Amino acid sequence: DKSDVSANMDETKYKATPNQYVGENTTVEEVITNPAFGDFGRLLFPVDRTVSEDMTLSEVSTSSVYVWYNYIQVDKTVEIINSLIDDANSGNQIFYNVYSEEEMQTDSSKRDTGLFFFKGEENAPFAIMNAGGGFMYVGAMHDSFPHALEASKMGYNAFALIYRPDDPYADLAKAIEFIYDNADELQINSNEYSLWGGSAGARMAATLGNSDNLAQFTGRTDIPQASAVIMQYTG
């Protein structure tokens, strides 16, 4: 139901103040309880991995949390989080549920999904970044947030998808549907978009970047095929 999905557009804007910026010694708990992140702060970190709220950003930015990844830079983690706080301070909505409240009540696992929005220029094309994690977890902080941030700096409207490792293709299809149906409110160009991904995310991008698969997963033929698919790497 588009009306249910569109209700997400009217959520309260989450704001923070400059003294709530984070640093490498900020704890996970302090991040997820920051007013900028409302009730979705936990999704900044992998919900399918054990991440203690007592860990600092320096401690969490390691391959012990983000398994299979190396060269994780806490400075980039800090930059990403503070950039989102800045966007919230500016009155921008930085997170969207892609499923309706009714859908999430029916299937609580859908609460572990959503789109972090790194806003670019008005009516510019959009991109959806899909992190890897071996279909075991979503390594967004290291494998999709940095790409979304840099794309937004270039003017593109970038979304980083938090998906369920057990149902990734359905979640990406729902995300594409949500963005397409709410393009006017999001102030984006819905006719030109790209799908990005690394590892598991690359497979997601390649699958949903195919028009037949897109129609199969969405049940619709009105949504255009992605203009580009960027498969960074996959195993």
Language model: regions and residue ranges:
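A short loop-to-beta-strand scaffold at the N-terminal edge of the catalytic core in hydrolase folds
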Residues: 107-119, 125-126
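A fold-wide structural signal in alpha/beta-hydrolase
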Residues: 126, 152-162
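N-terminal targeting or regulatory segments adjacent to alpha/beta-hydrolase or S9 domains
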Residues: 1-111
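Short amphipathic alpha-helices and their capping/turn segments at secondary-structure boundaries
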Residues: 114-120, 220-225
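Catalytic nucleophile-loop/oxyanion-hole region of alpha/beta-hydrolase
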Residues: 139-143, 159-190
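Short beta-to-alpha linker loops that shape the active-site pocket of alpha/beta-hydrolase fold enzymes
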Residues: 133, 162-164, 235
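Primarily recognizes the serine-hydrolase "nucleophile elbow" in alpha/beta-hydrolase
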Residues: 174-235
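Short beta-strand element of the alpha/beta-hydrolase
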Residues: 124-133
